[in-house]
Amino acid sequence: MQVVLGSLFLLLLSTSHGWQIRDRIGDNELEERIIYPGTLWCGHGNKSSGPNELGRFKHTDACCRTHDMCPDVMSAGESKHGLTNTASHTRLSCDCDDKFYDCLKNSADTISSYFVGKMYFNLIDTKCYKLEHPVTGCGERTEGRCLHYTVDKSKPKVYQWFDLRKY
């Protein structure tokens, strides 16, 4: 049943742009349709009644809750650290996205974590930002994403956008 729900969730997301569904539906309905089944924190917003409440897939949900509470985020259209988020969705520091990736990979809820990871890291075309020496190129690229950046260590670090790892 979880595999079927996960597949339906991915199908729904494949017709969306960022976290927003293109169909005309109400805000409450949107939030309910975009939260991964069996979780309260995995998706657009959350459905929890408080920070300690988790859904049926507690390990996956805990990863999503921690990710949602990242202290360094940039909302759509916001400028911060000398960067502007031109995406239609919130972007996070690479540190938070890396921790989210590792948490999902190590989760005891293997199937739900797999689908949430695939959705966030593979389907949603997003980037993260971090303080790093200026990027001079990409040493290795796959599926349109840079896997290994080359940097100029002779110059001071600046905030820049980076591709997320594939899940």
UniProtKB/Swiss-Prot annotation:
Residues noted as binding Ca(2+) in the record, renumbered to the chain: W41, G43, G45, D68
Catalytic activity: a 1,2-diacyl-sn-glycero-3-phosphocholine + H2O = a 1-acyl-sn-glycero-3-phosphocholine + a fatty acid + H(+)
Domain of life assignment: Eukaryota
Residues of the propeptide: 19-33
Active site annotation, chain numbering: H67, D97
Disulfide bonds: C42-C64, C63-C103, C70-C96, C94-C128, C138-C146
Post-translational modification: N-glycosylated; contains mannose, N-acetylglucosamine and fucose alphal-6 and/or alphal-3 linked to the innermost N-acetylglucosamine.
A Gene Ontology molecular function term of the record: phospholipase A2 activity
Residues of this chain annotated as glycosylated in UniProt: N46
Keywords linked to the UniProt accession: Allergen, Calcium, Disulfide bond, Glycoprotein, Hydrolase, Lipid degradation, Lipid metabolism, Metal-binding, Secreted, Signal
Compartment(s): Secreted
Free-text cofactor note: Binds 1 Ca(2+) ion.
A GO biological-process term: arachidonate secretion
A Pfam match: Phospholip_A2_2
Cofactor: Ca(2+)
Entry function: In vivo, intraplantar injection in mice cause spontaneous pain behaviors and paw swelling. PLA2 catalyzes the calcium-dependent hydrolysis of the 2-acyl groups in 3-sn-phosphoglycerides.
Note: The secretion of this protein into venom follows a seasonal pattern. This variation is synchronized with melittin variation, i.e. their production increase in the same months.
The protein, known as: Phospholipase A2
